[in-house]
């Protein structure tokens, strides 16, 4: 059983480093330019013992790469820098994060939740109801991605 809840931006860095960006020098540099933006919201997943096992961040942001992928008049939130510790994958931590993110985004008035999904995560996002809305593209130092979106 996993619980997802709001966390501070600084609480995302350790898991981002361990799960998403181990090639970076330290957790302190595992930030993104919009972490402290006005509409930024950060989410952590915690196991029954209270250990922080998953993370994502949400931003009130349209896609610069594929601006036409979602209806222009629809409000959107972007799910970004999501990951879970390898030992909890397939056990519900990621699903708890996405459910929380979708509910929170809907409460903010969003119609869509979208992400730049890593190729390895395509099956997970598809199981969560996301659909592909772009062709594939390459993200430097990370690998193949596609834009995916969930209608809220």
Give the residues covered by each predicted segment.
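Conserved catalytic-core motifs of GNAT/GCN5-like acyltransferases
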Residues: 114-116, 131-147
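Conserved GNAT acetyl-CoA-binding A-motif
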Residues: 98, 105-118
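Conserved beta-strand in the GNAT
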Residues: 44, 51-62, 66-70, 78-83
């Amino acid at each position: 059983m996993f619980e997802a809840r709001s966390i501070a931006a600084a609480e995302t860095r350790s898991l981002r480093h361990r799960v998403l960006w181990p090639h970076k020098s330290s957790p302190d540099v595992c930030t993104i330019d919009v972490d402290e933006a006005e509409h930024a919201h950060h989410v952590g997943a915690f196991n029954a013992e209270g250990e922080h096992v998953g993370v994502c961040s949400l931003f009130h942001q349209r896609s610069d790469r594929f601006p036409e992928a979602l209806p222009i008049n629809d409000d959107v939130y972007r799910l970004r820098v999501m990951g879970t510790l390898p030992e909890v994958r397939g056990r519900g931590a990621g699903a708890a994060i996405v459910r929380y993110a979708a509910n929170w985004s809907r409460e903010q008035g969003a119609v869509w939740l979208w992400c730049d999904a890593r190729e390895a995560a395509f099956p997970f996002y598809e199981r969560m109801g996301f659909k592909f809305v772009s062709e594939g593209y390459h993200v430097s130092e990370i690998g193949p991605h596609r834009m995916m979106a969930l209608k809220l």
